[in-house]
């Protein structure tokens, strides 16, 4: 069995009752450091405004005497904790269950399955800032209910040769995504992820899990003085951000370019393009039949490319995202490249298109409402015998956040969200659409 860690949309939908996975962050430590309110950097935390994005792109620096840690008060501690106590309800409308509970021989039937209760998604910790002027860092451990992981850890050299266009980062980091997964406003199980960032067709054996995962590598990035023009080019190990060199010895390349401009009557707008180009092994060297980590062979190519826009109209902002994906025929059919005879007749590399539209209504800094529609459509299946809609999905998400507290010391949001996902043909017995719903109410606070 291959060593891998990826999310196929049908597996997410079946498994989304098990865990709360999104992780996003605002960092009140920066507000304490500079004496600024959270709203200086956040349109609605954890979502950044243009000033916050510029501050982040500058390596968490304002360009004044407070940037270097040697000028900070000894009592300043650049650490943030984020916790989300909640109540949530999860529904699977076509769960396979025994016809007679406890009887494995009674046969399986589809039934609606519900569970609900109070829960805790874990504790997000972040320490970030500057080690010295123009040397930035970021470390993000996550304490889950059953594990502790290091979500991100990187160091960055800023303004090389005195130019804001030359910055270098190394470590495990979030890719410069078109719209940040880490800063998503939604936390519920069904609508808390941008699935088009993570999609892999059913039956595909690509080790790459999607641009939504932090990756291990090095990044060259830069921006204009007002942050209206930005670029990022990253070379990352082909291991989906997993430490320990578990796959092969190749590298993937990710690039993102965007440009903002002023539109009459509406102000700042932003457009961009991105691409991820990589290779994934199709088999491993073995010992007694067991794969040896790091010995991946038979590499085959894949890519994800797309375009996006962020549009502002009065108190509304609208995120639009489009993606086009392709995996090699061996990856799509989970066939080792050294055994081409195992490919089914008429096999091809899977191709798909997806995207989402997300709308925010932000009448004031303490309140924001949102709605999102996301979809994916397969345009070519890897195996011609596979139903043409296998891998298609539609997701609807609505919610709001109210912020009674937003200070340089802490922030708290009351949130309510509802999301519904339809996975075409994924019902385990009838082959109908798999349907999952998630309702979440809770507090999201950091300090």
Language-model regions: role of each:
Residues 35-45:
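The canonical Cys-X-X-Cys-His
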Residues 12-14, 24:
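Cleavable N-terminal signal peptides
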Residues 1-11:
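Bacterial N-terminal signal peptides that target proteins for export
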Residues 49, 79-91, 95-99, 111-241, ...:
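Outer membrane beta-barrel
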